[in-house]
Amino acid sequence: MKSWFISFALFFFSFAHAACFEEAAQRYQIPVELLKAISTVESNGNAGAINTNKNGSVDYGHMQINDWWLPKLEPYGITKDKLVEPCINTNVGAWILAQSIATHGFTWKAIGAYNASTGYKRLIYARKVERVLEKINSEAVALKVLGSYPKAVL
Protein backbone atom coordinates (compact mmCIF):
# COMPACT_ATOMS: atom_id res chain seq x y z
CA MET A 1 0.00 0.00 0.00
CA LYS A 2 2.83 2.40 0.89
CA SER A 3 4.43 1.74 -2.49
CA TRP A 4 1.19 2.83 -4.16
CA PHE A 5 1.24 6.14 -2.23
CA ILE A 6 4.83 6.79 -3.28
CA SER A 7 4.01 6.01 -6.91
CA PHE A 8 0.96 8.28 -6.78
CA ALA A 9 2.96 11.09 -5.18
CA LEU A 10 5.68 10.79 -7.80
CA PHE A 11 3.08 10.82 -10.59
CA PHE A 12 1.40 13.84 -8.99
CA PHE A 13 4.72 15.70 -8.78
CA SER A 14 5.36 15.18 -12.48
CA PHE A 15 2.44 17.46 -13.32
CA ALA A 16 1.45 19.59 -10.35
CA HIS A 17 3.93 21.92 -8.73
CA ALA A 18 6.80 20.73 -10.94
CA ALA A 19 7.84 24.30 -11.62
CA CYS A 20 7.83 25.06 -7.89
CA PHE A 21 10.20 22.18 -7.18
CA GLU A 22 12.45 23.17 -10.07
CA GLU A 23 12.58 26.80 -8.94
CA ALA A 24 13.32 25.93 -5.30
CA ALA A 25 15.94 23.37 -6.33
CA GLN A 26 17.71 25.92 -8.49
CA ARG A 27 17.45 28.74 -5.95
CA TYR A 28 18.89 26.69 -3.08
CA GLN A 29 21.14 24.37 -5.13
CA ILE A 30 19.39 21.23 -3.90
CA PRO A 31 18.54 18.31 -6.20
CA VAL A 32 14.87 18.47 -7.19
CA GLU A 33 14.56 14.73 -6.50
CA LEU A 34 15.62 15.30 -2.90
CA LEU A 35 12.95 17.96 -2.39
CA LYS A 36 10.33 15.66 -3.90
CA ALA A 37 11.49 12.78 -1.71
CA ILE A 38 11.20 14.91 1.43
CA SER A 39 7.71 16.03 0.42
CA THR A 40 6.73 12.40 -0.13
CA VAL A 41 8.09 11.32 3.26
CA GLU A 42 6.53 14.29 5.04
CA SER A 43 3.00 14.16 3.59
CA ASN A 44 2.85 12.01 0.46
CA GLY A 45 2.88 15.33 -1.39
CA ASN A 46 -0.35 16.56 0.23
CA ALA A 47 -0.25 20.34 -0.23
CA GLY A 48 -3.11 20.85 2.23
CA ALA A 49 -1.64 18.71 5.00
CA ILE A 50 -1.84 20.23 8.49
CA ASN A 51 -0.73 18.05 11.40
CA THR A 52 -0.54 18.66 15.13
CA ASN A 53 2.45 17.03 16.84
CA LYS A 54 2.55 15.42 20.29
CA ASN A 55 4.24 18.54 21.68
CA GLY A 56 1.40 20.75 20.39
CA SER A 57 3.33 22.30 17.50
CA VAL A 58 1.73 22.29 14.05
CA ASP A 59 3.20 21.32 10.67
CA TYR A 60 1.89 22.92 7.47
CA GLY A 61 1.77 21.90 3.82
CA HIS A 62 3.37 19.13 1.82
CA MET A 63 6.85 19.90 3.21
CA GLN A 64 5.34 19.94 6.75
CA ILE A 65 6.85 23.25 7.87
CA ASN A 66 6.69 23.41 11.67
CA ASP A 67 5.18 26.51 13.28
CA TRP A 68 8.50 26.92 15.14
CA TRP A 69 9.72 28.58 11.92
CA LEU A 70 6.93 31.20 11.79
CA PRO A 71 8.81 33.94 13.71
CA LYS A 72 11.76 33.51 11.32
CA LEU A 73 9.44 33.60 8.28
CA GLU A 74 7.39 36.60 9.42
CA PRO A 75 9.90 39.22 8.15
CA TYR A 76 9.39 37.72 4.68
CA GLY A 77 5.60 38.03 4.95
CA ILE A 78 5.09 34.29 5.30
CA THR A 79 2.28 33.31 7.66
CA LYS A 80 0.80 29.93 8.55
CA ASP A 81 -1.97 30.58 6.01
CA LYS A 82 0.58 31.10 3.24
CA LEU A 83 2.43 27.90 4.19
CA VAL A 84 -0.32 25.79 2.61
CA GLU A 85 0.34 27.43 -0.77
CA PRO A 86 2.36 24.73 -2.56
CA CYS A 87 5.05 26.94 -4.12
CA ILE A 88 5.64 28.90 -0.92
CA ASN A 89 5.76 25.67 1.06
CA THR A 90 8.24 24.13 -1.38
CA ASN A 91 10.52 27.16 -1.22
CA VAL A 92 10.38 27.37 2.57
CA GLY A 93 11.16 23.65 2.83
CA ALA A 94 14.13 24.09 0.48
CA TRP A 95 15.29 27.12 2.50
CA ILE A 96 15.14 25.09 5.73
CA LEU A 97 17.02 22.20 4.11
CA ALA A 98 19.63 24.63 2.73
CA GLN A 99 20.24 25.92 6.26
CA SER A 100 20.66 22.37 7.50
CA ILE A 101 23.12 21.66 4.67
CA ALA A 102 25.05 24.84 5.53
CA THR A 103 25.35 23.59 9.12
CA HIS A 104 26.03 19.88 8.53
CA GLY A 105 27.34 19.76 4.96
CA PHE A 106 25.59 17.88 2.18
CA THR A 107 25.19 14.76 4.32
CA TRP A 108 22.49 12.38 5.51
CA LYS A 109 22.79 14.14 8.86
CA ALA A 110 21.66 17.38 7.19
CA ILE A 111 18.75 15.60 5.52
CA GLY A 112 17.77 13.97 8.81
CA ALA A 113 17.97 17.32 10.57
CA TYR A 114 15.24 18.64 8.26
CA ASN A 115 12.81 16.63 10.38
CA ALA A 116 14.49 15.63 13.63
CA SER A 117 16.75 17.17 16.24
CA THR A 118 18.24 14.00 17.73
CA GLY A 119 20.78 11.69 16.11
CA TYR A 120 18.75 8.49 16.12
CA LYS A 121 15.60 10.16 14.78
CA ARG A 122 17.68 11.90 12.11
CA LEU A 123 19.02 8.55 10.98
CA ILE A 124 15.54 7.01 10.78
CA TYR A 125 14.25 10.01 8.80
CA ALA A 126 17.24 10.08 6.45
CA ARG A 127 16.73 6.39 5.68
CA LYS A 128 13.09 7.04 4.79
CA VAL A 129 14.17 9.80 2.41
CA GLU A 130 16.86 7.56 0.96
CA ARG A 131 14.31 4.83 0.17
CA VAL A 132 12.05 7.31 -1.63
CA LEU A 133 15.04 8.75 -3.51
CA GLU A 134 15.95 5.26 -4.69
CA LYS A 135 12.39 4.83 -5.98
CA ILE A 136 12.44 8.24 -7.71
CA ASN A 137 15.81 7.54 -9.30
CA SER A 138 14.90 4.02 -10.44
CA GLU A 139 11.69 5.33 -12.03
CA ALA A 140 13.61 8.17 -13.71
CA VAL A 141 16.15 5.71 -15.12
CA ALA A 142 13.34 3.41 -16.28
CA LEU A 143 11.60 6.29 -18.07
CA LYS A 144 14.86 7.32 -19.72
CA VAL A 145 15.51 3.78 -20.91
CA LEU A 146 11.93 3.34 -22.16
CA GLY A 147 12.12 6.70 -23.92
CA SER A 148 15.20 5.58 -25.86
CA TYR A 149 13.42 2.66 -27.58
CA PRO A 150 11.52 3.09 -30.83
CA LYS A 151 7.77 3.32 -30.24
CA ALA A 152 7.17 0.11 -32.20
CA VAL A 153 9.15 -1.84 -29.59
CA LEU A 154 6.99 -0.50 -26.77
Regions found by a protein language model. Name each.
Residues I6-F8:
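Sec-dependent N-terminal signal peptides
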Residues F11-A16:
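N-terminal signal peptide c-region/cleavage motif recognized by signal peptidases
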Residues A19-L154:
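Catalytic glycan-binding domains that act on GlcNAc-containing polysaccharides
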